[in-house]
Each structure stands twice: as structure tokens, then as C-alpha cells.
């Protein structure tokens, strides 16, 4: 793992969190229990404070950063999809930010909300609970349904379980030169399916 102190501030990572070895954490970063941080994530706490609360996840290639004297926060059980950028914003408890979305400075995503993939949330946006945000710039499409929230929670549970699985089952290795006979498939821990398959 790549951890860097910056002007005396050292990242804080709970022992029950998983941080992929290729992720980079710099300075004022606080990572809670059961958090999953994926490959190539960049958390640059060289200006503002970056906080990932318990049970949240920050997936592959995500970026967290913020201006001085700001907190960029992913609250408990927050779910940040591949390639998303969080800059000086707050993601509420149990909310989901979809893949390659951008959440700008001073924006607040309400608890149990979903930001659709590829959305752009403008600076200063103040969301409410259970909003479905879509587009660039993002607009409120409607309320998140109970079914969608259940789907989100199953996905978040997968990442909470993945943090545990990676702490014990992930290791650097050399590749095989051929596919072995009867190669097994990996399984998740819930019955979650892609939205298109529901």
C-alpha cells in the first residue's frame, strides 16, 4: 500500500478496512471499519480532510480531494462506483454514486440517494433523502424506490464482504501460462444481480 505523511499528517486506516496495494493515501485521510478501497484509488488529503466512514466503499480508479478547510465525506455504508470523482463534497449515509460520476465542491448527496452513472453534480447542490439524480448536470428524476434501495444495499454488502475476503484471500502472484481444466468461478456473498438482469 502507498501511504504518505504530508506535513506531519498521516493517514488513519482502521484495521478492519481493506486498502488495495495500488491505492494511494496522502495526508489527512481517515478510513473507518469495514471500508473497501479498490485498486488505483487516489485519496489526496494534502489540502482538505477525506473521510470514509464505516462500511463504505471507494472502488477502482476513484479520486477523492478537496480544498483547504473542507471535509470530503462518504458517510456510513456509502457506495462509490468505479472511476467516480468526489471533490469537496458529502455523500450521505447509504447513498450510491454511480460509475464515472463527478460530485463537485460543496455538494451534498442525501442519505439513501442514488446518483446514476456518468452524472455530474454541480458545486453547491443540496440534496434530500432518497433522490435519484441523473444527467449532466444532474437533476432529480424521482424518489428512489424500495426495490432500488434494496439493490443498492445488497451491492454495498458485497463490498463489505469483499473487504473481509481480500484481507485473507488476496495475494500477489505470477500468472499461469494456460487455463487450467475445470477452472472454478468466483462467487459473491449475496444474490445481487445487475439492474438489467432484474
Curated annotation (Swiss-Prot):
Residues 179-198 are annotated as: Disordered. Belongs to the transferase hexapeptide repeat family. It comes from the Bacteria. The keyword DNA-binding does not apply. This is Carnitine operon protein CaiE. Overproduction of CaiE stimulates the activity of CaiB and CaiD. Residues 180-198 have a biased composition (Basic and acidic residues). Gene3D superfamilies: Hexapeptide repeat proteins. The gene is caiE. GO terms for molecular function: transferase activity. Pathway: Amine and polyamine metabolism; carnitine metabolism. It holds the Pfam family Hexapep. SUPFAM superfamilies: Trimeric LpxA-like enzymes. Keywords: Repeat, Transferase.
